[in-house]
Amino acid sequence: AFSPQQAQGAIEELSRLLRYVLYENEAETVTLEKEIEFLESYVELMRLRLPSSVSVETNFDAVKTDGQAFVAPLIFISLVENAFKHGISPASRSFIRIRVDYDSSKRQLVFVCQNSNHPKTSKDKSPGGIGLKQVLQRLEHSYPGRYEWLYGTENDGATYSSQIKIYF
């Protein structure tokens, strides 16, 4: 159960997320820092519902661009959401790792999202795949010919990994 303070904080966080989605979605680009703040808020909100058996690690520390790097808004959220949707199992220990690095000398951004892989069961009939299509559409629209996207399973299928490199 949540305390009133936790509930208030969660509602404020949700409000920030919704404002970002509504107002920044129309922009061609946002600062990388703004996009990172959005991801951090999303991760913090999602942590509230997770059991202690789930490890969530983020590393956004290396992202210091002084507002000089811009990305398409909401470009990474589908992959982060997928990690929380598919990377958690109530029956076993699970993990999610998210990292963003920006190298100004190479003018390169690297986004990595990894999670424990819990394949869908035959009972899970929820539709899927739209998030990955949206990521590809955003990459093609915003960075035609200037990105690499690798995704799939690693460690004998135990880990799902997605890595995007964007060249500015």
Predicted features and spans:
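Two-component histidine phosphotransfer core
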Residues: 1-154, 159-163
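C-terminal coupling/interaction segments
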Residues: 166-168
